[in-house]
């Protein structure tokens, strides 16, 4: 699959770190370091615009090392870049750690994962007719217990 990209000056294409990687690294397109205080959110530009093929999306996901070591997460994980979006890819990062985190210029801050998209047809059913029944029913949010 090919994704065409427009790049701002000095910006690198997303890169897969290993042959088997599913996520391509996205880098911070910033001129100066950004300090992210504990509990703070920031919008990090990448300097990349993408032309994603119809029927696909690009999901923006956290980097596991940043999450584990520093508590840095993509807030709307996974973030979705739709096939019809042509603006700059920006990443909403939050610091859930206990220390200030410094985002350096060109730092790898997130991953881009290409995924297929299926658009559903939503249909209203009459409440008398209702939805089909299942053994689970409407039980959710921890109904199966913790063990």
From Swiss-Prot:
It comes from the Bacteria. Its cofactor is Mg(2+). InterPro entries: dUTPase, dUTPase-like, dUTPase-like_sf, dUTPase_trimeric. It catalyses: dUTP + H2O = dUMP + diphosphate + H(+). Substrate binds at residues 63-65, 76, 80-82. GO terms for molecular function: dUTP diphosphatase activity; magnesium ion binding. It is an enzyme of class 3 (hydrolase). Keywords: Hydrolase, Magnesium, Metal-binding, Nucleotide metabolism. One of its GO terms (biological process) is dUTP catabolic process. This enzyme is involved in nucleotide metabolism: it produces dUMP, the immediate precursor of thymidine nucleotides and it decreases the intracellular concentration of dUTP so that uracil cannot be incorporated into DNA. Belongs to the dUTPase family. This is Deoxyuridine 5'-triphosphate nucleotidohydrolase. It comes from Chlamydia felis (strain Fe/C-56) (Chlamydophila felis). The lineage of its organism: Bacteria, Pseudomonadati, Chlamydiota, Chlamydiia, Chlamydiales. The gene is dut.
